[in-house]
């Protein structure tokens, strides 16, 4: 990897709202230091199936992760597996479903909330399980991972946008 990658997944954020409201990120895009992509959503349009789809490239119907209650390790190779196999450092500050898909399932908070294990696909992680976990805390978690481990691939997955959309 020539450059480290930070993937920010803003579940539930409309593309046009993102283009309008995320001026700081748009400045990075304009400077050629970031990218903004409009994705065509796979079906079903549910969170866990789409996390699996984004991180593996495999459609939900093919991965078997077809609803939010499928709680098991993925049977697909994810970006975490490819990065780890290439000797790269991986990290995530994300909802616990990501940990369940790629590290261990079921998620056990005392064991899995703070992950620091080079043998796991997601080697370093801070995982949360409350939908209303503050985004400010999540971004602080991500920055801690970035500073401490300098990951080549870091997923940042805040939940407050999606949580607000369900209320």
Where are these regions (language model features)?
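Active-site-proximal alpha/beta segments of enzymes that process anionic O-linked groups
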Residues: 2, 15-149
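Residue-level marker for buried hydrophobic side chains located in beta-strands
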Residues: 6-8
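DG-centered beta-turn motif at the end of beta-strands
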Residues: 10-13, 83, 159
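A short, flexible beta-alpha/helix-coil linker loop
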Residues: 13, 61, 161-164
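Active-site His/acidic residue clusters
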Residues: 140-167
């Amino acid at each position: 990897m020539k450059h480290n990658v930070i993937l920010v997944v803003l579940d539930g954020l409309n593309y046009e709202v993102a283009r309008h409201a995320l001026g700081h990120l748009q400045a990075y895009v304009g400077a050629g230091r970031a990218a903004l992509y409009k994705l065509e959503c796979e079906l079903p349009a549910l969170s866990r199936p789409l996390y699996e789809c984004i991180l593996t490239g495999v459609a939900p119907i093919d991965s078997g992760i077809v609803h939010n209650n499928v709680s098991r390790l993925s049977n697909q190779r994810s970006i975490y597996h490819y990065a780890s196999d290439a000797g790269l450092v991986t990290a995530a500050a994300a909802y616990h479903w990501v940990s369940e898909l790629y590290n261990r399932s079921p998620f056990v908070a005392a064991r899995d909330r703070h992950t620091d294990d080079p043998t796991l696909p997601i080697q370093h992680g801070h995982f949360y399980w409350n939908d209303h976990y503050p985004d400010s805390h999540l971004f602080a978690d991500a920055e801690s991972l970035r500073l401490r481990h300098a990951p080549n691939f870091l997923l940042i997955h805040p939940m407050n946008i999606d949580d607000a959309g369900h209320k």
